[in-house]
UniProtKB/Swiss-Prot annotation:
SUPFAM superfamilies: Ribose/Galactose isomerase RpiB/AlsB. InterPro entries: RpiB, RpiB_LacA_LacB, RpiB_LacA_LacB_sf, SPI_LacAB/RpiB. Its EC number is 5.3.1.-. Keywords: Isomerase. This is Putative sugar phosphate isomerase YwlF. Gene3D superfamilies: Sugar-phosphate isomerase, RpiB/LacA/LacB (3.40.1400.10). One of its GO terms (molecular function) is ribose-5-phosphate isomerase activity. Induction: Negatively regulated by TnrA under nitrogen-limited conditions. The gene is ywlF. The active site is at residues 66, 99. It comes from Bacillus subtilis (strain 168).
Amino acid sequence: MKVAIASDHGGVHIRNEIKELMDELQIEYIDMGCDCGSGSVDYPDYAFPVAEKVVSGEVDRGILICGTGIGMSISANKVKGIRCALAHDTFSAKATREHNDTNILAMGERVIGPGLAREIAKIWLTTEFTGGRHQTRIGKISDYEEKNL
């Protein structure tokens, strides 16, 4: 598996924690920033490139972190083919993979701490899509997307 990871200025610390986790899990990743120091940056400038790498197949999944995770999630979901879910608990992280086959995880650094972020990311990275009735539902989303976006 190969993962693209990015954050804005509000998610740098958790981004670094998740990179350490992926090193431990021997998961290959591309760090797509931000290298923002103390400056403020705009989350869409990081969400769109990660989402584009996922839909192009260059990476399998993406992880996005901002202050709340909301802006990253909204931005990523504007890219056709993306199923980005915001998760701030382990139950949701697992369900987004098992039931929704999410290809991007969003988290908020101002909402959760680094320990919980690592747990969420580990579960999300190691959980597989269950298919079955959930595949039918994903298919309906994809059909709608093809017709309307």
